[in-house]
Amino acid sequence: MKKQLKVIIYVDILFAVLLLFFWFSLPKPLFITPTSYVLEASNGELLSASIAKDGQWRFPLADSVPEKFKHCIITFEDKRFYNHLGVDFIAVVRAIRQNMQAKSVASGASTLSMQVIRLSRKKQRTIFQKLAEMWMAVRFEVSYSKEEILTLYAANAPFGSNVVGLEAASWRYYGRPAENLSWGEMATLAVLPNSPSLVRPGKNASRLIIKRNNLLDKLVEEKIIDRATAQLSKAEPIPSAPLPLPQNAPHLLNRFKDEMKALKVNTTRITSTIDENLQKELNRLTAQYHQKFAANGINNLAALVINIKNGSVVAYVGNCYLPQQKEMESHVDMISARRSPGSTLKPLLYASMLNDGFILPQTLISDVPTQIGGYSPQNFDLGYDGAIPADRALSRSLNIPAVKMLQQYKYERFYDKLKKFNFSTLNKPADHYGLSLILGGSEVTMWDLSNAYLGMARTLNHYNDYQGKYNNADYGSAYYVKDQEKPEEVIEPTSLLDHGTIWSTFNAMEEVMRPGDEGLWQQFSSSQRIAWKTGTSFGFRDAWSVGLTPNYVVCVWVGNADGEGRPGLTGIEAAAPFMFDVFRLLPSSKWFEMPKTKLKRIAVCKQSGYKASPICETKLVQWVPPVGEKTALCPYHKLIHLDAAETYQVTNQCYSVTQMKHKSWFVLPPTMEYYYKTKNAEYRILPLFMEGCQQEQTAVMEMIYPKANASIYIPLEIDGNRGKAVFNVAHRNNNATIHWHIDEEYVGTTKNFHQIALSPKPGKHTLTLTDQNGERLVQVFTVLDKEK
């Protein structure tokens, strides 16, 4: 009895060991081979793919297998597939009998389950390996459904050359997805894994046709297809050689490779948010412009289109893709490249100053020759307006007003604001950039720049959705993975910029004259309203244009990836036409809704754009952000006293108060006035004081160059002698005579036009100017010595 009990225990132990061995004999995961990176459009169509790390075209596991392939592969390889548990013993007995009769391997008995095991193990086949495959195939069938087994087979079967898996084979041999293949095409693919090294497209074509036709006949016998379908399928040609896979978004595919971990995606295949038709049209447009630009040595351009409504990327062209021309550097993704932004940050400064109560939309900004700590910004046209409304300075992209505005706003504050806009490339302290920050002194990426404008547009679009409040998630990054998890809504009473500020900024950005339209585009009812801004970096290295409607943000860049500058490479000439052609590919939309509860009607001085003071002559009522109430009153209107004929200024010391006429007068500082009056014919210069009247202490002269306490350098001429610097002063009286002195030494006299060429020695000097009325201007400047 005890002996029998021991036997039972030993048998149970043996059975348990065998059961454990059986259970753990199947490796997990079954396949650890690398797969190709695959990028699909939002409709599931293939956009781009790259070869796997082991040099094979092997797509990730698909969700299902096309019905045609199921019928073909089961009929050809394993007709009792649905009736066995991994091993087809009927086929085994048949194979043994046939092989014994032929005295060689004339027939096999591998089921599809066994073939999947063999593909996963990749070991040399022996009788023992065959038995192991049978064992593991049974174990395989225990854990996997028949559909899962077919899916694994279809994804890992060899199809000749370096093509692995049905999806890769379908694209390589037929240029389209497997579900779109005909019976003849699917039968051709189904027979390839049987002997992929001997029979494949481009090799042994006649044998491949025979095998395909035999399979089609079997499908007729099994009543899967009819005879007519089989005959038509036999007439189809077989592919002659592998085809290149689509490369409609190669740069986005590479971006996905780099960001795969951050995106928390566990497969190398993603369905993107890209609109397939728009992407192809944008590729065509990019190639068209590349052909045009290449004649001028401009090799690279990129375009990004984002759907504002949901924040999804609908088109992504990182460069004009020309892999066969390596000198073009078309592999560089310019959407993620760090480049100088030129003037494209100016709207963000304009919006920040509106939002924080520094200016109103049309506040006059100084536009005169400027020196700030040795830094001398220049307008692109090298001219000066004297003073210009802030919104017009933005639309004309003037550099000096932008620097003046940043000087007022403080570059440290603007730097912090850009950080909140999520510009990832500002990795140095604010002092490193200084005032050049507004003129392209930093680096940005197209991605970050587009996301900044996307956040503003989304915020304004959501004005009604959140009852005037703000969702901080609006400033989150755009996304390109279709099912990517969206950030949670965080509703706050305030945001980076308020609705009224954004609306005012977009209106200012809309007023730019479009290239080729000569300012008349607004007269056409079909014209799309677009807020847009161009940018050109120093040395003509980068041309930018970014634009938006309530539905889309479009950002384009034109230039050379290696940073070489080219004549004519400007935002308005190169990038803007490209951007507007991109907008023509997109549906039109209405303009942004006016956020009336976030705007306030206040009286504004027509001439200065400041909040109107009581003595402003002409007032306008404008919609401005409520914080505009905090801005300063107009500083340029002054109450002056005139004689009865309104010819001269007078004082009570020389003229009867009862006969005086008191008038409000628009008066700019001398330097601003000097340039402003040449561009504005309606500007009236202050009348002179009547003879014998004591003048009030108002500035009548102002130095244009050099500014007070400026350090200047006077270069040496070719002959080795020191050259001359042109000193320039503005005087309110056009007929004034000015006497010039340097260090109390007389150097010359000017009348009407007050410029003089001087060559002071290196060192510190005192400049003294005196006009015919005894008015004096004294200031200090320093001439630098190059040798020191």
Predicted regions and their residues:
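Soluble, non-transmembrane domains of envelope/secretory-pathway proteins that act on or interact
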Residues: 1-5, 485-491, 529-788
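Juxtamembrane regions of bacterial inner-membrane/periplasmic proteins
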Residues: 2-295, 312-314, 368, 404
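Short pre-catalytic segments that frame enzyme active sites
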Residues: 38, 45-59, 168, 197-201, ...
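Residue-level preference for non-acidic, small/hydrophobic
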Residues: 44, 73, 116, 149, ...
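Acidic/histidine-enriched alpha-helical segments
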Residues: 88-94, 136, 167, 206-208, ...
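Conserved catalytic neighborhood of penicillin-recognizing serine enzymes
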Residues: 101-125, 179, 242-258, 359-414, ...
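Glycine-rich, acidic and aromatic/proline-enriched surface loops and short helix-turn segments
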Residues: 115-122, 155-162, 179, 183-195, ...
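A penicillin-recognizing enzyme superfamily signal
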Residues: 272-293, 305-307, 316, 324-337, ...
